[in-house]
Amino acid sequence: MALKIDFNNVFHPYLQKERLGEADIDGYKEKFTSALVSLREKKEKGELGFFHLPYLPEEEIAEIEKTAREVREKFKYFVVLGIGGSALGPLAVHTALNNLRYNELSEELRGGPKFYVEDNIDPERMASLLKVIEPEKTVFNVITKSGATAETLSQLLIVTEVLKKKVGKRFTEHLIFTTDPEKGSLRALARELGVKTFAIPPNVGGRFSELTPVGLLPAAVTGINIRELLAGAREMAERCERENLWENPAGLAAAIHVLLLERGKNMAVMMPYADSLKYMADWYAQLLGESIGKRLNRRGEEVFVGQTPVKALGVTDQHSQVQLYTEGPFDKLLIFLEVERYRNRVVIPPDFPQYAELKFLGGHTLNELIIAEKKATEFALLKARRPNYTVIFPEVNPYTVGELLYFLEAKIAFMGEYLDINAFDQPGVEEGKKATYALLGREGFEEKRQEVLKVKKEPRFILE
């Protein structure tokens, strides 16, 4: 069964002046048609490669599956070294579709290697990883589209030294590079060393790359059916081609986001009611923030537009964030992820009936409780005039996860068209990169180093 998306709580009368009307959406039909035509043209010209990913050629799928089988047969650990989309996507899909205690399961129950995603350069984190893995039994999947990501390359240098000490000249057998098919230092190094590689299409940005080998190889290594993942994405791709705005999930969701953004809803909270979907909110945070947060529109005019992503988890954050969402500023749109059928059923025993707080729970299940709490939170927010909508999973499986990934990516593409911004670049990230290079003495960044060092801090504003 396919994902359902329930937009009722954007239009409900309870919202009063915070609601959208059907006329608001009808007024977007011309913009939608124009956006759909524009996106189709860019797709046909090969400018937006993520639209093609659900239709990955059979030979590419087979090669990913072959490599995954070899890793599963020969190695005890599989470590992703990457940052941003190179890490968030693999982690989100792994957590969604594998056992939540995956690494703690026995090797027999796992059926594959332990899985780690190292997406930060905190020295304590790297040191702790090296204490729990056996490098000689590990494959490191180094992922960077540009082949020049400083954080990822620093990790590569560290693990390469460790591997050389453990296995000598065979260290290359423990490396897989996922990068640009032609350009970049990582591609050049792979040619020099003879390292196994997978290609990220040049027309696919990092945050849109989960359905490339960036995400498909780690998924296959941990036993996920990547064919079903792609099949779900194809299903959603067809739905997102519909020419009626009211029937196009991505076009309609994007219109809702932009209309509410124009009315002051400058934050978008994603709140899954499933621990398995927790890291989907992390992945989506990059997708929304990096794609839509822009200073300039496509005409070069300053617009400073964006919708700040916020991550929450139901029911955990009912006890930390929901107070703010119900009684704080009217500046948020909430997106719930709901699961109709969880993969496990846990009964709450009917014990200690003399206590009312325990009696009413007995005989129910955790499944019933979490579903009730989601509906209750949804109601409370609606009553407090806070717009929200729900993405409903019949169950969490590779097919529905593939649908979700494509839906969110296509929604972002439509938002970019509606806002007249480039949703596929990230110029605001570049200044920090250049300053990092300068501070570490990279050649060619001497002037930038002087510029950075000119910025002084006043001791009087530093408390000791």
UniProtKB/Swiss-Prot annotation:
GO BP annotation list: gluconeogenesis; glucose 6-phosphate metabolic process; glycolytic process
HAMAP family to which the protein is assigned, alphabetical: G6P_isomerase (MF_00473)
Functional description taken from the UniProt entry: Catalyzes the reversible isomerization of glucose-6-phosphate to fructose-6-phosphate.
Family: Belongs to the GPI family.
Pathway listed: Carbohydrate biosynthesis; gluconeogenesis; Carbohydrate degradation; glycolysis; D-glyceraldehyde 3-phosphate and glycerone phosphate from D-glucose: step 2/4
Keywords on record: Cytoplasm, Gluconeogenesis, Glycolysis, Isomerase
Subcellular localization(s) per the UniProt record: Cytoplasm
InterPro entries: G6P_Isomerase (IPR001672), Phosphoglucose_isomerase_CS (IPR018189), SIS_dom_sf (IPR046348), SIS_PGI_1 (IPR035476), SIS_PGI_2 (IPR035482)
The organism's place on the tree of life at top rank: Bacteria
Lineage of the species this protein comes from: Bacteria, Bacillati, Bacillota, Clostridia, Thermoanaerobacterales
Reaction equations catalysed: alpha-D-glucose 6-phosphate = beta-D-fructose 6-phosphate
GO molecular function, one term: monosaccharide binding
Primary localization class, coarse: cytoplasm
GO cellular component terms given for this protein: cytosol
Active site: 290 (proton donor), 319, 433
Pfam families: PGI
PANTHER family, per database record: GLUCOSE-6-PHOSPHATE ISOMERASE (PTHR11469:SF1)
Protein name: Glucose-6-phosphate isomerase
EC number: 5.3.1.9
